[in-house]
Amino acid sequence: MKGSRWFIVFIVAFLFIMFAIEYHLPKNFVWKPTFGHHDEQPFGCAVFDSVLSSSLPQGYTFSRKSLYQLEQEDTTQRRGILVISDNLRLSDVDVNALLKMAERGDKIMLVSTLFGRYLEDTLQFRSYYSYFSPMALKKYATSFMKKDSLHWIGDSTVYPRQTFYFYLQLCSSYFWGDSLPERVLAQRVFESNEFRYETEVDSLTTDSLVYMPVAMSRRWGKGEVILVSTPLIFTNYGMLDGKNATYIFRLLSQMGKLPIVRTEGYMKETAPVSYTHLRAHETKANL
């Protein structure tokens, strides 16, 4: 009986130790893009926001307001507005609000793979969307395939030209080269055969390389609208991916010395009531 009791004690102790070890082991990563302020997974923004709030001397704050709500705020201080999403289909109300803010001198940075036709028509650009697959990213990373390159070509008097390397799935969306931006900040480089295969377009180019913008800006009034097609880089993963945080800071530096407000108002679970719904409610209340 005494031996059995010690055996039971040993088993219980062993199970307790194994439970403690498993509890402290790193949890499996979830590669779903959320861009959430409290999400510590690779494609959340908990670390991203924390680093920026402690690194940007001009200030970095977080909001859940829509562009319309931000535009309606009574403030004389100019700001940088940052919106990160994988599907930013802005309505005409959103677009008009952001253009009003830019007109006054604010700088608006929109980071997404999709922007909506109204904004594209207004600013005269077109984007190429590529679907993100976590399984494809995992397969690409574990096969040790060569990373794709993004070339910084912004103002060389401020930053030297530099090449940054990312997995293909993080930078597979871009803007068409015949878009009419005022200034290209960064571009992705394709081999011409790869470009024809990916876009299914019969390119007439005879060059061996094709350059497509992934970040560009356009002045609007006293301010600026900055478009970036690689939202997965603006995450915890992108911030912690070796030296690639430099790429993020270069893009954010386009807002100059303005304090930056990142709004989470266009995430599905936190999206505010739309302007049209607000107006409809107000109309009913006044009847």
Region locations from a protein language model:
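Membrane-embedded segments
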Residues: R64-F144
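Aromatic-Pro/Gly-enriched surface loop or interdomain linker
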Residues: K2-E71
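Soluble non-cytosolic domains of exported or imported proteins
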Residues: P42-F43, R89-D92, G242
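Second-shell loop/turn segments in exported
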Residues: T34-D39, S85-D86, Y237
